[in-house]
Amino acid sequence: QGDSNHENIAPSPVSVTISSREITPAITLSGSGLTEANGVYSYIYDGTAKTPTVTVTDNGDEISDTEYSVSYRDNVNAGTATVTVSDNNGGNYIVNGTATFEITKKAPAFTPPAGIPGLQYNGEAQELVTAGVCYEGTVVYSVNNGNYSTAIPVGTAVGTYTIDYKVLGDANHSDTVPATLTVEIG
């Protein structure tokens, strides 16, 4: 409504567009079995896909999970896994980012070798132990501080033999610390 110095103007619609705000999200991971130390998240390998819960924040404010989708890559075997947060169109925010977590190798389960008791000298090479069994790596042996080998240790001469053994883990299982047993040929 105009006054004596201004004309009347008819109202007209005004169009306003509110754009989504692009953020650089802080991504936090959580979930059963997930540990965090010094900013590094990790699980221990167990053969299952790891899908930690993802929380996204912007300057400390949590962003609704309807704003983004989550996908996982390399999240089954030991190594570094990636969590990708991808924007869902039409929200209040544009949210894109990644986080990583580690899947650490698990200690292998194995049956250790056992020394064969009562061995007597017979002039021929004799196996000194029953074989260790491991399906999550390879059992290797060393006789009297020699090189490690997958061959079952043998001895011929009368005496005491020191057998060191360990498991060389596979891609998802760690190596074990060497252990020692002694066997005698009388």
Task: Put a short name on every predicted segment.
Residues 1-186:
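Solvent-exposed beta-strand/loop surfaces, strongest in extracytoplasmic domains of secreted
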